[in-house]
Design a protein with these regions (language model features):
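A general "terminal functional-core" signal
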Residues: 1-142
Length: 142
């Protein structure tokens, strides 16, 4: 990982595990000066969405209590959507909207609302457009 030794970057990942490439365990927390600046939340396939959202909210709360970002970058993995043929986390559009809202509220408090979002995954073209649209709408909301 590019920033694993950098204490100026906090890296958070919530993802299906085990999954390719096999990294992202809870024990991976950074390296050298960056130790403690990585938080992985590995989830088993089909983890109930309520548990995923609880884990997400808890992780963001933990990060916000010890790290004050200048900017938040979201690398949105929409392959966690329930309609996606690849992932098996089964999140719905409303789950992505709620998680986006949590990050946006943190950004509003911590870094004047500065958020960049890029798309990382999502392979069902029938659902992807609406999911991305809902995510972007939430980012744009006041």
């Amino acid at each position: 990982m590019l920033f694993r030794s950098d204490p100026t970057v906090f890296y958070f990942s919530m993802h299906q595990y085990p999954w390719y490439p096999g990294t992202g365990t809870r024990g991976e927390t950074g390296h050298r000066r960056g130790l403690g600046y990585t938080l992985n939340v590995p989830l088993r396939a089909t983890t109930p969405t309520v548990d995923q959202r609880r884990a997400f909210d808890s992780a963001i709360g933990e990060i916000a209590s010890k790290f004050s970002p200048d900017l938040i970058i979201i690398s949105a993995g929409f392959d966690a959507h329930k309609g996606d043929p690849l992932g098996q986390l089964l999140l719905g559009d409303e789950d992505f909207v709620q998680m986006t809202r949590v990050v946006k509220e943190w950004a509003d408090e911590a870094c004047a609302g500065r958020v960049i979002s890029c798309m990382e995954g999502g392979y069902n073209l029938d659902t992807l457009g609406e999911t991305v649209r809902a995510h972007v709408r939430e980012l744009q909301s006041c």
